[in-house]
Amino acid sequence: MIVPEDARRFAGRALGSWRRRRGTTPPAVDATGFYAATTVGPGPRGAVLATESMSGPAGATTWRVRYRTLDAADRPVVASMAIAAPTGPAATPRPVVAWVHGAVGVAPGCGPSRTGFDAWYGDRLLGEGCVVVAPDLTGLGVEGSTHPYLHGLTAGRAVLDAVRAAAELSTTGAGPVTALAGHSAGGHAVLWANELAATAEGDGLDVRLAVPMSPIGDLTVTMARYADDDGRAAFPVQLAATWADVEPVVPADALTPAALARLDDLHTKRLAGLQHTFRGHATRWIRPGGLTTGAWAAALERQSAGRRPGAAPVLLVHGEADDDALVGWTTTLAETIRTTGTEVTLRTYPATDHMAIHDAAQDDVLASLSRALGDDG
């Protein structure tokens, strides 16, 4: 694809051996202090604040990184990520692929980089000569701030600044050419990052392709379904409980007293644990109409994806048997993106559910990334 001398070091490796942790165990403990709350002063976005070596794929050098980004109110905050690069010097600047995880919980200890390098297709992308960055997203990983679940502006900024941080680490060999990929909530972050990259927020970056996989796009439609569903209440609860710092909304307007009484669980449990806490029909936890009227409705509309032009073409992939994020949502999303003037391709996969999309779409996704990152314009 791009850097053949890097590819040889990864020949024959299995695909996707480093994948997202999905457990019921409590969030990871920060044993080294790397993720301790950190005050961040003036400085450029994406500035590297600290690094720490960590285990990762064979043939790659892998680090945890703390870097500077902005929250939705333009306040500087510290975010964390994992980054892996082929070991050894790069003959030419390496392209960067940012992989954005789906829902994991909202506590700092849920940050994927705390437990390892976590990116689908990571082995293959490294073998193709790419640098792979896996941002935790603001509030996940580093202590001291709240992760506003599905808040597009916050997530999009953290993704773009993770790419900037990769380029600042000279040992990675990372250049400006970038692709963005992510699953579910991570797909929402990718869409936002691509849209931000088309503005001054993307200065210095060359984004070539965005690949949202089974993404969340229209937050109003998504939350309306989840708030009147059996078994998915943890998702609107996470959103309603974490947006007060980034939007003019009040959690109690959307959450029932029963939900408000259990919000401490958000600080101690991963997603699967939260799904157990907030089990049963969502109306036990979400006020009827609470997320679809008034200030909450306006906030969800503001943070929905696909409303603004993107810097790069978009490849949407979605499983037709997905009952978590419906394929019809993404069909509509493709139409919405098209109205912005952004090039968009939609590919759907029969008999494929929310998680199976990774394997079903891998050939299409990897081939598309190869073409985009290998295009010299």
Regions found by a protein language model. Give the residues of each.
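Short, surface-exposed "cap/lid" segments of acyl-processing enzymes
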Residues: 71-129, 142-143
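Structural cue for short, hydrophobic secondary-structure segments
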Residues: 99-102, 134, 316
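Primarily recognizes the serine-hydrolase "nucleophile elbow" in alpha/beta-hydrolase
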Residues: 164-235
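Catalytic-loop region of hydrolases
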Residues: 1-89
